[in-house]
């Protein structure tokens, strides 16, 4: 769906300057004229674009209960960070890496097995049943990535009496009973090869101790807390559970996900391209693969087209595998594979 706010600009009240396709004078303008070209293209290409279906192998597990519980406490008094402030950087990292994701929640818990990887950010409040379902997902071969403050309290926001991170501890292979507000802390012993400034530890950190067979992907770089794990990875059943005990910066999140995607066999041609080139792939009603190549920048962008031979639908050009594609500033090409 392509939606516009609004059809025309309102003339009074709070939405006066939430401009529409038409201005306050109801006259055609560049925005309106551009929308007309989009409508004409859609009308011309209906048979190729309608019925577009997309299958994602990665999902975020989100929860209104966890959001409400975390937002009430955050990281303590005077902390301004909310649930979505933690979720969004993790989503943004995958978006920029051209990894399509779905969002699932406790009401769709039975769909977990549809995904090869599930990211679970700050699942602060959750019932035993939900945590056990996530454990079963890993046991059956799923790859899960938890962040800090997951499994901490039950659905009533009552903190669990067990070692943290609660019931998920048996799949994460770690535990903690000390938490710290980080100051001048980075990580060490990792393979992410970033500058120290990009390996910062933000907002909050859990001092993780691991079970004997749990792998440590990073430790905290700090004179007192250097023996504690920061990122851990544990095999459980047929699957793998990764646990991030702190809030990373944007570049570090990207490197963590790059490593995790490769381990889950989810690193492919799309991931060789990064923002501002964004790729959206699906199948149309004719059963043919459609790829949208979008340039979200004010500069021309070029890429090697490494997919199957096809047709660029907007201009009708034939596209060969290995051909160089050039995207105009803010431009798009839509390629249907033969």
Predicted features along the sequence, with ranges:
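Carbohydrate-binding surfaces of carbohydrate-active enzymes
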Residues: 1-338
């Amino acid at each position: 769906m392509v939606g516009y706010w609004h059809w025309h600009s309102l003339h009074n009240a709070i939405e006066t300057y939430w401009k529409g396709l038409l201005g306050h004078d109801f006259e055609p303008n560049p925005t309106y004229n551009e929308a007309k070209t989009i409508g004409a293209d859609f009308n011309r290409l209906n048979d190729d674009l309608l019925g577009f279906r997309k299958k994602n192998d990665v999902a975020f597990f989100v929860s209104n209960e966890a959001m409400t519980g975390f937002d009430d406490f955050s990281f303590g008094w005077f902390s301004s960070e909310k649930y979505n402030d933690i979720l969004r950087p993790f989503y943004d990292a995958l978006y920029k890496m051209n990894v399509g994701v779905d969002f699932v929640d406790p009401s769709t818990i039975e769909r977990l097995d549809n995904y090869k990887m599930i990211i679970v950010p700050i699942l602060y409040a959750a019932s035993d049943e939900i945590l056990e379902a996530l454990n079963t997902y890993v046991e059956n071969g799923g790859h899960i990535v938890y962040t800090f403050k997951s499994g901490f309290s039950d659905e009533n926001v009552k903190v669990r009496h067990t070692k943290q991170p609660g019931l998920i501890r048996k799949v994460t292979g770690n535990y903690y009973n000390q938490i710290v507000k980080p100051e001048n802390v980075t990580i060490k012993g990792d393979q992410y090869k970033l500058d120290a400034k990009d390996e910062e530890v933000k907002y909050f950190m859990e001092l993780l101790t691991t079970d004997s067979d749990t792998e440590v992907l990073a430790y905290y770089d700090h004179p007192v807390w250097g023996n504690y794990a920061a990122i851990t990875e544990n095999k459980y059943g047929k699957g793998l559970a990764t646990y991030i005990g702190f809030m990373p910066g944007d570049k570090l999140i990207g490197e963590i996900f790059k490593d995790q995607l490769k381990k889950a066999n989810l690193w492919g041609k799309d991931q060789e391209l990064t923002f501002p080139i964004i790729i959206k792939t699906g199948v149309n009603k004719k059963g043919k693969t459609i790829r949208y190549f979008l340039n979200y920048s004010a500069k021309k962008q070029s890429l090697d087209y490494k997919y199957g031979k096809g047709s660029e639908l907007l201009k009708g050009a034939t596209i060969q595998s290995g051909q160089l594609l050039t995207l105009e500033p803010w431009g798009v090409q839509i390629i249907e594979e033969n």
